[in-house]
Amino acid sequence: LMVLHLRQNGVSDDQIIEMNFESMDFRRMTAEELYRYVKERLPEKKRAYLFFDEIQRIDQWQDAVNSFRVDLDCDIYVTGSNAYLLSSEYATYLAGRSVEIKVLPLSFREFLDFHGYVVRESKSPTGGMRKRIYDTDGESYEPQELLDAYLRFGGMPGIADVGLDTDKALALLDGIYSTVVVRDILERERRRGQRQITDPDLLRKIIMFLADNIGNSTSITSISNTLVNEKLLDQGRKGNPSVHTIQAYVGALLESYIFYEIKRFDIKGKEYLRTLGKYYIVDIGLRNYLLGFRDMDTGHIIENIVYFELLRRGYDVSIGKVDNKEVDFIAANAEEKRYIQVTESMNEPTTRERELAPLRMIRDNYEKIVIAGNCNHPITEDGIKIIRLTDFLLDT
């Protein structure tokens, strides 16, 4: 998209150099060969735009990139699929000279755009505004109908190419999973010379455990105990993995951006806690692929969706603790802070009280919201907004 943007704004093809280091054309290059290759193709008396995908495959790539920055009139775009690209040892070379942009799977609104749907608003007979979604043939849908598809298939852009077909989606997600696991974890660790992360079966079991426990308080010890006690490990395995080994595998999953970890924050004490955190999976379609598309745990699924939507909107997100109660998310940036509860439904009185109680205990004046998957009438109660999940996700 950036290359297209440049061309649409008058940048000529000879100014753009694109290299994908998964291609056999480039994957055996050294840093010195990369430097010479680019220099030989520079435009005369014009700025160059260099695009390097998966450049971490090149040993000492950072030396070449730093030399381009010093020696050439150019803009440099480096893309990769894991945090290893910007690990501390490499980021040091580029500190203060680069901007990191994290790219997530599609939001619900982007999912609709990719599939050719349009969101329109009209006045509701009961007051306020009502959203409807239309396809290219003009057929209309309730937002919840399309949200159900998003919760099933997830936000990987490739889903738009195969359509909302379960078998085709499974094939696509299987390819994504295999690529992430084989290339971005096992192969990367092998190149690093690490010997801890070598077992694809153990890696898959840990991934499935975390996918099945999104939004639950989870410790490394609990992962290890569950794998052993429920006999989920390969019976031919010699010995049980240590907690240290499990920690290494989980760390690799976080580094590959398959899972994100969220920490707890004491609202009254105003400090992060060293108690159990939670994990969320980067794409809910990937979770459904791993667990067989079984329809369960909707509450944690929509919690997962809300967490990543908050990240897309530029918030730092933590779990809130107020006395002995928990707030699902504290979302903060330089301008604002929001306390957010997420629930499948607000229609039952006991659920309503459970979700509202922690927010009532917070004495500051920041915005407090409950996002409900099933909410008959969005209202404000005790200064707390209660809104539908679809409205939150479609709010721009």
Regions found by a protein language model. Give the residues of each.
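A cross-kingdom feature that marks ATP-driven nucleic-acid transaction machinery
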Residues: 1-11, 245-396
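Loop/turn-to-beta-strand initiation segments
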Residues: 46-49, 72-77
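Short regulatory helix/loop adjacent to the ATP-binding pocket of P-loop NTPases
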Residues: 84-100, 112-117
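Conserved P-loop NTPase "ATPase switch" module shared by AAA+ and STAND
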Residues: 43-61
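Short glycine-rich substrate-engagement loop in P-loop NTPases that contacts/grips substrate
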Residues: 17-46
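Interdomain hinge/linker elements that couple catalytic modules in large macromolecular machines
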Residues: 118-302, 308, 316
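Conserved catalytic segments around the Walker B and adjacent sensor/switch elements
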Residues: 5-23
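Structural recognition of the conserved hydrophobic beta-strand(s) that form the central parallel beta-sheet
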Residues: 75-81, 102
